[in-house]
């Protein structure tokens, strides 16, 4: 009885096929694995899968700025120093190269300055021996990025609440050479000769340091003082060797002062009488005072 009932039930209610069951009845087995991805792709834009495509490219500078005219001026300050100026529109951080070009492929003098700004004073400039003509080339390269730190860029599209079902970003590749990590610089070069700079307003061929000037002034003062002293000190010595005229005048003056005053010849008797009267009066006065 039971086998017959089972056969009747099997004939009346056939079982669903083994293949394609998930397609015919999606509610029984649940959504497929890629359902969330497909749904997000239909409603929202696809999430970035590569770091390069997600990161926004750096805005490229127009060609006018890259091909800007060289606004570089060189001024000679002293015999072995140069003052270099260039325009600020070329960038914030600049690298400067200076080297000689008339040595048949070998630089007689070369100097490099990293991250400098105008104006720049270059001292201890190497000069060619024998006063030969020296041609130099000055190159300035500037960038527009200040203090960029090396590291992996973060995509702007990724947020803190991003779903975990998104594919992970690939690991950052090891950094390449140093000259490939930074921003490309556009160098602007200027060729000049040292002999051409002698007519500049700041050129001082015979300019000396302050120490030499002070020493020269001191030695000049010493020479003047010694010259005046050499003219003055022999005067009293020479006067000591010529005492005849001065002593004769001194002797005559002392004799005239010591001699008594001369009395005229006609007044001798009167003067004697006056002197006797004065002596008598003095004697009387002294006697009266004694009593």
UniProtKB/Swiss-Prot annotation:
Give the bilayer topology: Multi-pass membrane protein
Q: Name one GO cellular component term.
A: membrane
Membrane spanning segments where? 221-241, 261-281
Which sites carry carbohydrate? 71
Q: Which GO terms describe its molecular function?
A: peptide binding
Task: Look up the signal peptide feature and give its range.
Answer: 1-20
Instruction: Could you list this entry's UniProt keywords, alphabetically sorted.
Output: Glycoprotein, Membrane, Signal, Transmembrane, Transmembrane helix
**Entry annotated with the keyword Cytoplasm:** no
Entry keyword Glycoprotein: yes
Task: List where in the cell it is found.
Answer: Membrane
For this chain, the Swiss-Prot or TrEMBL PTM comment says:
N-glycosylated.
User: What protein family is recorded?
Assistant: Belongs to the TMEM158 family.
According to UniProt, the name of this protein is Transmembrane protein 158
Protein source organism: Bos taurus (Bovine)
């Amino acid at each position: 009885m039971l086998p017959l009932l089972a056969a009747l039930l099997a004939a009346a209610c056939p079982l669903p096929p083994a293949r394609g069951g998930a397609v015919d009845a999606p509610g029984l087995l649940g959504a497929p694995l890629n359902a969330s991805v497909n749904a997000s792709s239909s409603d929202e834009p696809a999430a970035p899968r590569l770091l390069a495509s997600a990161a926004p490219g750096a805005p490229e500078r127009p060609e006018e700025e890259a091909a800007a005219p060289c606004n570089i001026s060189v001024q000679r300050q002293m015999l072995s120093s140069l003052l270099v100026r260039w325009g600020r529109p070329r960038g914030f951080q600049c690298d400067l190269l200076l080297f000689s070009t008339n040595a048949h492929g070998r630089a007689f003098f070369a100097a490099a300055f990293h991250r400098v700004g105008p104006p720049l004073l270059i001292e201890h400039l190497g000069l060619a021996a024998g006063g030969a003509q020296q041609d130099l080339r000055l190159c300035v390269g500037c960038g527009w990025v200040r203090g960029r730190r090396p590291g992996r860029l973060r995509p702007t599209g990724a947020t803190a609440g991003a779903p975990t079902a998104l594919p992970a970003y690939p690991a950052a590749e090891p950094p390449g050479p140093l000259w490939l990590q930074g921003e490309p610089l556009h160098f602007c070069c200027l060729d000049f000769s040292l002999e051409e700079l002698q007519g500049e307003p700041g050129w001082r061929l015979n300019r000396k340091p302050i120490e030499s000037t002070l020493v020269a002034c001191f030695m000049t003062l010493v020479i003047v003082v010694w010259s005046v002293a050499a003219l003055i000190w022999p005067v009293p010595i020479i006067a000591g060797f010529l005492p005849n005229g001065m002593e004769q005048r001194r002797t005559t003056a002392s004799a005239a002062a010591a001699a008594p005053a001369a009395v005229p010849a006609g007044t001798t008797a009167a003067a004697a009488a006056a002197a006797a009267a004065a002596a008598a009066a003095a004697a009387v006065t002294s006697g009266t005072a004694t009593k």
